[in-house]
Amino acid sequence: MKTFVAKPETVKRDWYVVDATGKTLGRLATELARRLRGKHKAEYTPHVDTGDYIIVINADKVAVTGRKETDKLYYWHTGYVGGIKQATFKEMIARRPEAVIEIAVKGMLPKGPLGRAMFRKLKVYAGGEHQHAAQQPQVLDI
């Protein structure tokens, strides 16, 4: 018996919608990364993008445990000399709630072209509305 190897043109991708309300950030991000990679499928192949499309709604209502709301810091650089910036989790949720989930999931995906292709299948929205109704996403309870 030969080992099955998925081909990019034969992979079937589904669309799922996940409500992040009250979900713990890390636990949500690990499951999203797993499904974006396709590891939940029997035909998973490490060098082929076999994952599904994931839509996350209510990203502004994601939760963290302990004192991470005030202690967890996000850093970025503006590109100018001395341009290092930082914001707490609470400030990031107020400024750009989508970025919190995107950063958490991106760190759990492979680095390189395949990981970037997987990350493009993640769609995150701060509110309860999304623009992917035509894809008929199934509700995924995590």
UniProtKB/Swiss-Prot annotation:
PANTHER family assigned: LARGE RIBOSOMAL SUBUNIT PROTEIN UL13M, RIBOSOMAL PROTEIN L13
Keywords: Ribonucleoprotein, Ribosomal protein
Pfam family, one: Ribosomal_L13
Descriptive protein name: Large ribosomal subunit protein uL13
Cross-referenced InterPro entries: Ribosomal_uL13, Ribosomal_uL13_bac-type, Ribosomal_uL13_CS, Ribosomal_uL13_sf
GO molecular function, one term: mRNA binding
Subunit structure: Part of the 50S ribosomal subunit.
Functional note: This protein is one of the early assembly proteins of the 50S ribosomal subunit, although it is not seen to bind rRNA by itself. It is important during the early stages of 50S assembly.
Biological process according to GO: negative regulation of translation; translation
Family as reported in the entry's similarity comment: Belongs to the universal ribosomal protein uL13 family.
SUPFAM superfamilies per UniProt: Ribosomal protein L13
Designated gene of the protein: rplM
Entry GO terms, CC: cytosolic large ribosomal subunit; ribosome
